Amino acid sequence: MAELTISASDIEGAIEDYVSSFTADSGREEIGVVIDAGDGIAHVEGLPSVMTQELLEFPGGVLGVALNLDEHSVGAVILGEFEKIEQGQQVKRTGEVLSVPVGDAFLGRVINPLGQPIDGQGDIEAEGRRALELQAPSVVQRQGVSEPLQTGIKAIDSMTPIGRGQRQLIIGDRKTGKTAVCVDTILNQREAWATGDPKQQVRCVYVAIGQKGTTIASVKRALEEGGAMECTTIVAAPASDAAGFKWLAPYTGSAIGQHWMYDGKHVLIVFDDLSKQADAYRAISLLLRRPPGREAFPGDVFYLHSRLLERCAKLSDELGGGSMTGLPIIETKANDISAFIPTNVISITDGQCFLESDLFNQGVRPAINVGVSVSRVGGAAQIKAMKEVAGSLRLELSQYRELEAFAAFASDLDAASKAQLDRGARLVELLKQPQYTPYPVEDQVVAIYLGTGGHLDSVPVEDVARFESELLEHVKASHGDILAGIRESKKLSEEAEQKLANVINEFKKGFSASDGSSVVVNEAEAEAMDEADVEKESVKVRKPAPKK
C-alpha cells in the first residue's frame, strides 16, 4: 500500500495558482428599507436612483411598482400579498419596468394582470414580452376607420356603427345590459374566426376590472357555450384583488392586444369597466398622499384613461394595417353622464352608446337611448346596404320619442301623428333583441328594411317579433340568394330590393296575427270619374260684393 505524503510546496503552489486566477465579483446594489406599509402601499427609504414605474423586489419575491418619487423616500404600490411586508425589511431595485408575456397561446385562457394563468390549465408558452407603458401610435402611423366591426346588435350596427380601430364607449347605470352588449359583440366574431382568414378574424380581449368572481365566471361560460372563447383572452382583476391589480389590468389587456395589432391582425378589447379602474387609482393616489381634485380624483386621472384608449387605432398599411377596437364601459349613477369620469371618457372616445335604465325596465333591450348615442367615425365603415335601409331610422325613432311624450298630454292627434306613433312603436319592437343572439349583417339589413320600408305598418305590435323571425326563416329557406347577395356585395341593389319587397308581400298573405286576423291591407280602389265630368269646372268662385 502506497504511503500518502503531503508536500508543503505542492499545497503552496496550488494555493498560489487559485489566488492568481481568482477575480472578485464586485457590484453595486441599491437597497432601500421599508419605513411603513399598509393597504397595498409601502413607503421605502433610500433607492436614490430608482425610476418611475420601476419594479421593486420586496422580501418573499413580492413585487411593487414605484409611483411616488419623493426627496427621501419612494411610494410603491404592492402587487400581491402585502400583509407580510413589515417596517425595516429590505427592498431591492430590479432595473426593469412592468411587462407582460404575449402571444397566440393566450387565446382561450384566463390570466391575472401580471400575465400569469389563473384558470388551472397549466403554463402558457409566450412568444415574447411587452412593456405595459408604451407610446400610442402617432398620427402618421394611423389611417382612417374604414372597415366595419359588426356587433350583431341591430340597434348598434344600424344607428351607431363601429369601425375597426374605433373607441366606442358603452355607458349607463348598473344593471342596464352594458356587459351583455360587449359579450354579444365578442360572440358575433366567432363566424369570422371560423373562416380562418386573417383579414376577417378578430382576436378578442375581455378585461374584467373589479367585477365579482361569479360575474367573470358567467362571462367565461357564455363565451365557451357560444364558441367564442377560443378567440378570446380574459384578463381578470376581480373585486377581491388589491387596488394595484385593478389599476394595471387594462394596460395588461392593451399590451396583449397591441402585440397582435402590430402583427397586422385585428383585435377587439373590452374594458369592463373603467369606472372601477378610476376608483382604484383614486384609492392608490390618496394613500400615496397625492393632492385630490374634483370628486377626490387625482389631477392625472384624465391621462390615466387617455393614454390607455389612444392605443386603440387602425394602423397604416406600411405597419401592416392591423387594428385594435376598444369598447370601454363606464357606469353612471342615476343616468348622470355629466359626472367627472363619464365626461372625461366621452371626450376621449369616438362615440358612445347610452343605455338607459328606464328603457331597460320597460323591456326595451338593448336599452339604447337613440337621442344621446352617437358614432362619430363609424359611419364611414358602415356597409352600403345598411346605410340605405337605416338612413331614416334614427330620425323616425327620435320623432317617435318626442311625439310619445307629447301624446301623453294630447287628447286628439292628427292622422299623420298617429301613423308616426304607430310606425315608431313597431320600430322599437323590431330593435329588441334577446341576449346571446347576435344577427348576421345580412339578416339585420332585411329586418331594418321591414321597419323603414313600412312593411310592418299593418302588423300588430305584439306580432312584430314573430313576423320578423318567421320571415327571416322563410327568406333563408326559399330565397337565400337575396341574403347571399347582400353578404357578398355589401349592397342592396334595386333588383334585390324589389324582389325582397315581393317576398315580404307574398309572406304577408300566409301570415296570421295572434288574434287570427290577416295583415294584408286591402286598399279601397278610387272610383273612376265619368268622362263627361273630366273637363267640368267643379270649383265655384264667389265674387265679393261691391262696396257701397
UniProtKB/Swiss-Prot annotation:
<dbReference type="InterPro" id="IPR005294">
    <property type="entry name" value="ATP_synth_F1_asu"/>
</dbReference>
<keyword id="KW-0067">ATP-binding</keyword>
<dbReference type="InterPro" id="IPR036121">
    <property type="entry name" value="ATPase_F1/V1/A1_a/bsu_N_sf"/>
</dbReference>
<keyword id="KW-0066">ATP synthesis</keyword>
<protein>
    <recommendedName>
        <fullName>ATP synthase subunit alpha</fullName>
        <ecNumber>7.1.2.2</ecNumber>
    </recommendedName>
</protein>
<feature type="binding site">
    <location>
        <begin position="172"/>
        <end position="179"/>
    </location>
    <ligand>
        <name>ATP</name>
    </ligand>
</feature>
<keyword id="KW-0813">Transport</keyword>
<keyword id="KW-0547">Nucleotide-binding</keyword>
<feature type="region of interest" description="Disordered">
    <location>
        <begin position="526"/>
        <end position="548"/>
    </location>
</feature>
<keyword id="KW-1278">Translocase</keyword>
<dbReference type="GO" id="GO:0043531">
    <property type="term" value="F:ADP binding"/>
</dbReference>
<dbReference type="Pfam" id="PF02874">
    <property type="entry name" value="ATP-synt_ab_N"/>
</dbReference>
<dbReference type="InterPro" id="IPR033732">
    <property type="entry name" value="ATP_synth_F1_a_nt-bd_dom"/>
</dbReference>
<dbReference type="InterPro" id="IPR004100">
    <property type="entry name" value="ATPase_F1/V1/A1_a/bsu_N"/>
</dbReference>
<dbReference type="GO" id="GO:0045259">
    <property type="term" value="C:proton-transporting ATP synthase complex"/>
</dbReference>
<dbReference type="Pfam" id="PF00006">
    <property type="entry name" value="ATP-synt_ab"/>
</dbReference>
<dbReference type="InterPro" id="IPR027417">
    <property type="entry name" value="P-loop_NTPase"/>
</dbReference>
<keyword id="KW-0406">Ion transport</keyword>
<comment type="subunit">
    <text>F-type ATPases have 2 components, CF(1) - the catalytic core - and CF(0) - the membrane proton channel. CF(1) has five subunits: alpha(3), beta(3), gamma(1), delta(1), epsilon(1). CF(0) has three main subunits: a(1), b(2) and c(9-12). The alpha and beta chains form an alternating ring which encloses part of the gamma chain. CF(1) is attached to CF(0) by a central stalk formed by the gamma and epsilon chains, while a peripheral stalk is formed by the delta and b chains.</text>
</comment>
<dbReference type="InterPro" id="IPR020003">
    <property type="entry name" value="ATPase_a/bsu_AS"/>
</dbReference>
<keyword id="KW-0472">Membrane</keyword>
<keyword id="KW-0375">Hydrogen ion transport</keyword>
<dbReference type="GO" id="GO:0005886">
    <property type="term" value="C:plasma membrane"/>
</dbReference>
<dbReference type="GO" id="GO:0046933">
    <property type="term" value="F:proton-transporting ATP synthase activity, rotational mechanism"/>
</dbReference>
<dbReference type="Pfam" id="PF00306">
    <property type="entry name" value="ATP-synt_ab_C"/>
</dbReference>
<dbReference type="InterPro" id="IPR038376">
    <property type="entry name" value="ATP_synth_asu_C_sf"/>
</dbReference>
<dbReference type="InterPro" id="IPR023366">
    <property type="entry name" value="ATP_synth_asu-like_sf"/>
</dbReference>
<dbReference type="GO" id="GO:0005524">
    <property type="term" value="F:ATP binding"/>
</dbReference>
<comment type="similarity">
    <text>Belongs to the ATPase alpha/beta chains family.</text>
</comment>
<feature type="site" description="Required for activity">
    <location>
        <position position="373"/>
    </location>
</feature>
<dbReference type="InterPro" id="IPR000793">
    <property type="entry name" value="ATP_synth_asu_C"/>
</dbReference>
<keyword id="KW-0139">CF(1)</keyword>
<comment type="function">
    <text>Produces ATP from ADP in the presence of a proton gradient across the membrane. The alpha chain is a regulatory subunit.</text>
</comment>
<dbReference type="InterPro" id="IPR000194">
    <property type="entry name" value="ATPase_F1/V1/A1_a/bsu_nucl-bd"/>
</dbReference>
<keyword id="KW-1003">Cell membrane</keyword>
